[in-house]
């Protein structure tokens, strides 16, 4: 573990509190609602989605609105690129101000140290930069020393998804491609995550390490069945590598990943995860057949089954740390009802879920292009709608979310018929929602229906959780 940095103050300044300050516990098993604010640095433009949403200008106002709902737990970003402007030189002024706003409202944050590609510009080669590992550990140590009251933390948001998009799919910097590119980034990043986790365990032993990543499920028929088998192995490799879980090189994806120079990945020291955060969207489930790949899957097993798989595999406390739906407010109401219903089913089956997070609380920007375009284009996914002026607007979804956060069961939420394009994307869900009493959306939010044709193929077998 690295030694304490000489650059750190001897005691916390305005942003910190005495180390003996009592930590708020994370929520118990149940349906506690958790909020979240989106902060991702656009890879090409150097613009932060948090700024485009206007949150930086109205932190207090956003937190007051959230506090009015009774929701105290939230995922909250710390912006490395706005803290360490040069190697080893930290400017805490902005972060101290925001942390004080959280403390003043008795909020319980899960701080997000790095959200996707949100690292400083001086790391010119991003995750592949030879300075990245030491820099991440230095930054993580500095945060832990300055804010010893923090109750929970995420070191890197969605490490598998982030490094897969940056290292395998060439969508984000450093634009590597293929299994060789992914292997390169994992060798660069995972050792530093292990070291940073050890650092936090030493400095803040009572803080909870919340590991957050995509919660996927892959199924298929015919030639697609083998692809699904590989993808189902792939979804687990990053967490397995840092926890030492099932590292059998006969596994279809793990074996390829840890060959040809990747053997060191099997020898990483392990880190401890206290809570496993599941990010589940309609596109988290994929289906493969003769025609290719389909996401969202036309044969989804559902959130309850997917959460059960992760519970069985890792034996950890779980949280639903992200879900949303890009669509009209009425579409989001129905997706909230669906995911909350599935969450309640999982709880009834004994899945240890500790929180339900619709993410983000305010519309984000430019995710319709996976951040390839930085146009400030509002992404209609939030609890509060982002309008061109930067203000927030309440919608029918805002009211539904607030009712659910106050304890309203999923069955008592409205069931609005999905509108285009959500009706096409979510057609595979409809058999599992036959018990709903559907309602037409208000005329002001109606759009023409679009016919959908599902791919041919037999329904894939579901795992045991889907039948419990």
Predicted regions, residues:
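Aromatic- and glycine-enriched glycan-recognition loops and surfaces
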Residues: 50-69, 86-101, 130-138, 298-305
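N-terminal carbohydrate-binding accessory modules
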Residues: 2-69
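Active-site region of glycoside hydrolase catalytic domains
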Residues: 4-29, 99-100, 104, 108-330, ...
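Short, basic, glycine/proline-bearing loop/turn elements
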Residues: 45-49, 84, 292
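Long, low-complexity, intrinsically disordered segments
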Residues: 451-468
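Catalytic domains of carbohydrate-active enzymes, especially glycoside hydrolases
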Residues: 57-79, 269-271, 275
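Conserved strand-to-helix beginnings and helix N-cap segments that scaffold or border functional pockets
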Residues: 88-92, 330-336
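Short active-site-proximal "capping" loops at secondary-structure junctions
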Residues: 40-42, 79-83
């Amino acid at each position: 573990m690295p030694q304490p940095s000489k650059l750190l103050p001897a005691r916390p300044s305005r942003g910190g509190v005495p180390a003996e300050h009592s930590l708020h516990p994370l929520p118990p098993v149940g349906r506690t609602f958790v909020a979240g604010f989106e902060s991702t640095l656009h890879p090409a433009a150097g613009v932060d989605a948090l700024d485009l949403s206007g949150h930086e200008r109205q932190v207090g106002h956003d937190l007051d609105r959230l506090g009015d709902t009774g929701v105290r737990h939230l995922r909250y970003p710390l912006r490395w690129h706005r803290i360490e402007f040069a190697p080893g030189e930290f400017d805490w002024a902005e972060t101290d101000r925001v942390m004080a706003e959280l403390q003043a409202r008795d909020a319980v944050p899960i701080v997000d140290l790095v959200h996707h590609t949100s690292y400083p510009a001086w790391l010119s080669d991003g995750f592949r930069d030879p300075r990245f590992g030491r820099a991440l550990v230095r930054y993580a140590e500095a945060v832990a020393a300055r804010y010893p009251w923090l109750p929970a933390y995420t070191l890197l948001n969605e490490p598998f998804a982030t490094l897969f998009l940056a290292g395998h799919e060439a969508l984000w910097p450093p634009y590597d491609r293929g299994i060789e590119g992914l292997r390169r980034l994992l060798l660069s990043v995972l050792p530093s995550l292990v070291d940073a986790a050890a650092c936090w365990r030493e400095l803040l032993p009572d803080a909870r390490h919340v590991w957050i990543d995509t919660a996927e499920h892959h199924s298929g028929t015919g030639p697609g069945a083998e692809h699904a088998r590989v993808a189902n192995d792939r979804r687990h490799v990053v967490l397995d590598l840092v926890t030492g879980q099932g590292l059998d090189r006969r596994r279809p994806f793990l074996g390829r990943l840890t060959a040809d120079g990747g053997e060191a990945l099997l020898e990483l020291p392990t880190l401890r995860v206290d809570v496993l955060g599941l990010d589940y969207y309609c596109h988290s489930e994929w289906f493969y057949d003769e025609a290719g790949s389909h996401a969202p899957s036309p044969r989804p097993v559902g959130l309850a089954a997917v959460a059960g798989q992760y519970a069985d595999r890792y034996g950890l406390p779980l949280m639903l740390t992200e879900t949303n739906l890009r669509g009209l407010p009425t579409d989001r109401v129905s997706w909230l009802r669906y995911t909350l219903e599935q969450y309640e089913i999982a709880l009834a089956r004994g899945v240890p879920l500790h929180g339900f997070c619709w993410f983000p609380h305010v519309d984000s920007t430019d995710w319709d292009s996976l951040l390839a375009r930085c146009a400030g284009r509002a992404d209609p996914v939030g609890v509060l709608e982002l309008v061109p002026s930067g203000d927030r607007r309440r919608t029918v979804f805002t009211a539904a979310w607030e009712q659910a956060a106050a304890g309203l069961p999923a069955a008592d939420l409205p069931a609005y018929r999905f509108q285009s394009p959500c009706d096409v994307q979510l057609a595979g869900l409809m058999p599992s929602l036959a018990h709903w009493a559907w309602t037409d959306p208000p005329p002001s939010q109606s759009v023409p229906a679009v016919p959908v044709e599902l791919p041919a193929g037999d329904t894939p077998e579901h795992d045991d959780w889907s039948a419990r």
